[in-house]
């Protein structure tokens, strides 16, 4: 019997394919996005050292109110602000296998507006 592939499995395969090609360094770390049904998380990661340099999510106390897309843009602004404070300006954007639309797009555009270059 033919079964429809699981959406999350397809996303994980896309993400693995992209991750094999991109990697974050200390000079140009990776801005990773994870999206759950309720929250969105963003991390700036140095893959060489295996360290998270900066992170932000909708669970942070600075983020409040609005739709999920508005919250995602607040997370993007917050992660960019924290990265710029640590003198990180250039990043590689890792959309985590998600389509560049909606919450992922809102986070990316807010991060760009607040000083990150990618």
Curated annotation (Swiss-Prot):
Matching PANTHER family: 39S RIBOSOMAL PROTEIN L18, MITOCHONDRIAL, LARGE RIBOSOMAL SUBUNIT PROTEIN UL18M
Biological role: This is one of the proteins that bind and probably mediate the attachment of the 5S RNA into the large ribosomal subunit, where it forms part of the central protuberance.
GO biological process: translation
Any one GO cellular component localisation term in the record: cytosolic large ribosomal subunit
InterPro entries: Ribosomal_uL18_bac-type, Ribosomal_uL18_bac/euk
Encoding gene per record: rplR
GO molecular function: 5S rRNA binding; structural constituent of ribosome
Region of interest (Disordered), ranges: 1-20
Bias type Basic residues, positions: 7-20
Keyword field: Ribonucleoprotein, Ribosomal protein, RNA-binding, rRNA-binding
Subunit and partners: Part of the 50S ribosomal subunit; part of the 5S rRNA/L5/L18/L25 subcomplex. Contacts the 5S and 23S rRNAs.
Record has Methyltransferase as a keyword: no
Protein name per the record: Large ribosomal subunit protein uL18
Gene3D superfamilies tied to this protein: 3.30.420.100
Highest classification ranks of the organism: Bacteria, Bacillati, Bacillota, Bacilli, Lactobacillales
Family label: Belongs to the universal ribosomal protein uL18 family.
Organism annotation: Pediococcus pentosaceus (strain ATCC 25745 / CCUG 21536 / LMG 10740 / 183-1w)
Record keyword Ribosomal protein present: yes
């Amino acid at each position: 019997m033919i079964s429809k592939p699981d959406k999350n499995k397809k996303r994980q395969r896309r993400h693995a394919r992209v991750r094999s090609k991109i990697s974050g360094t200390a000079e140009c770390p990776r801005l990773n996005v994870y999206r759950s049904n309720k929250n969105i998380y963003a991390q700036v990661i140095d893959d060489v050292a295996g360290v998270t340099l900066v992170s932000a999510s909708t669970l942070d106390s600075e983020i409040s109110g609005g739709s999920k897309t508005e919250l995602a843009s607040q997370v993007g602004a917050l992660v960019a602000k924290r990265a710029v404070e640590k003198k990180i300006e250039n990043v590689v954007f890792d959309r985590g296998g998600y389509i560049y639309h909606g919450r992922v797009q809102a986070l990316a555009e807010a991060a760009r507006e607040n000083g990150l270059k990618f």
